[in-house]
């Protein structure tokens, strides 16, 4: 639900920015790689306990993640979403790993969340490829991770709640995928 609202709000300015970037011959793949690098930097910042810079890096990662899709739409460059989704999943599952590195007492909660996010990402990718859907599903995860960065002592609670939501989302996608059409 949150992602649908965010998409309606953020797509028009992203599409406008994408047209400008396309005019300068900026490719979606370059934006995807930049988003990935920012995501890796956010993971490192979390691991070192720099939570506020991590929130900024995550926000920039999410912004570029949306922008690479907008550039792809503007250029009609075809389905580049698998590369973006794969790199996005590495960042998404790396964030809980960063929290575990920052404080090993969070390792079990981080492992639970990594498993849940990996399952949800796999289900999302497989059903999106089959149905031609896009890969916008990260608004809730961003809010949860930003909250965890602002209140790192609450990471385990955030991890368990987000993990349950991710498992439910994966189950719902799998149920929809096997339902006769």
Which residue stretches match the model-derived regions?
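N-terminal membrane topogenic signal
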Residues: 5, 25-29
């Amino acid at each position: 639900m949150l992602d649908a609202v965010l998409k309606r709000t953020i797509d028009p300015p992203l599409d406008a920015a994408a047209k400008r970037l396309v005019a300068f011959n900026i490719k979606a793949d370059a934006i995807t790689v930049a988003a990935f690098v920012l995501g890796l930097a956010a993971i490192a910042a979390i691991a070192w306990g720099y939570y506020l810079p991590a929130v900024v890096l995550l926000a920039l990662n999410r912004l570029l993640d949306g922008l690479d899709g907008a550039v792809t739409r503007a250029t009609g460059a075809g389905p580049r979403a698998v590369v973006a989704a794969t790199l996005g999943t590495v960042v998404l599952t790396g964030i809980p790993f960063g929290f575990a590195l920052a404080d090993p007492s969070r390792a079990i909660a981080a492992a639970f969340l990594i498993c849940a996010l990996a399952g949800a990402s796999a289900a999302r990718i497989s059903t999106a490829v089959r149905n031609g859907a896009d890969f916008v599903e990260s608004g809730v995860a961003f809010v949860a991770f930003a909250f965890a960065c602002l209140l790192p002592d609450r990471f385990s609670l955030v991890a368990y709640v987000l993990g349950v939501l991710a498992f439910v989302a994966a189950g719902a996608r799998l149920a929809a995928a096997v339902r006769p059409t």
